[in-house]
Amino acid sequence: MDLQAMRREYGLGSLHREQLEADPVKQFEKWMQQAIDSNLLSDPTAMTLATVDAEHMPSQRIVLLKGYDHTGFRFYTNKNSHKGQDISENPQVALHFAWLPLERQISIIGSAVPLDDDDNDRYFHSRPKESQVAALASQQSRPVESRDVLESHYQSLLKDYENTEVPRPQSWGGYCVHPKQFEFWQGGQHRLHDRYQYSKDRENWRITRLQP
């Protein structure tokens, strides 16, 4: 397979300094809304979460953005999972949105802070009951003998909680990533991409154009 021969050109647009919001969260919101309105992405909220464990080994996976504001960017997971363990050992993480049909990427670096029980309960019980039961049934990242074993356990729990509220597992909850740095990337012709980095300077954000 000759991957080196594969070529594509970027030409959907450009990104100029005067087009940027002074506030990176507002810039993120602008691009997120455009991504949603484009109907070109199956899920614009899907983002790569990169973590590093105590042995300095990196790992990454796709999670879903469930909310954001000037405090940070929120997602939910099983805290006993690989990513949860990584975050407990090293809260410095990176988020990455790859909106390839729009020739855009957003990178965010920050610290992941656990959400409180009230927030976790509120979101957990807003989910479909089937999803709540699935969270209860799965010991995420642990070995399982077969799919049948997992399905059988799930169906048993689904029956148990058919007419009662599903308790949120203590291992299930969310994190808020407090951003320290953003980068907005727009594909450009001849690989001369437009890149802008937002870096926190005390209470303000400093915007720097980066070479592609």
UniProtKB/Swiss-Prot annotation:
This is Pyridoxine/pyridoxamine 5'-phosphate oxidase. Pathway: Cofactor metabolism; pyridoxal 5'-phosphate salvage; pyridoxal 5'-phosphate from pyridoxamine 5'-phosphate: step 1/1; Cofactor metabolism; pyridoxal 5'-phosphate salvage; pyridoxal 5'-phosphate from pyridoxine 5'-phosphate: step 1/1. Its EC number is 1.4.3.5. The lineage of its organism: Bacteria, Pseudomonadati, Pseudomonadota, Gammaproteobacteria, Alteromonadales. It comes from Idiomarina loihiensis (strain ATCC BAA-735 / DSM 15497 / L2-TR). Belongs to the pyridoxamine 5'-phosphate oxidase family. Catalyzes the oxidation of either pyridoxine 5'-phosphate (PNP) or pyridoxamine 5'-phosphate (PMP) into pyridoxal 5'-phosphate (PLP). Signal peptide: none annotated. Pfam families: PNP_phzG_C, PNPOx_N.
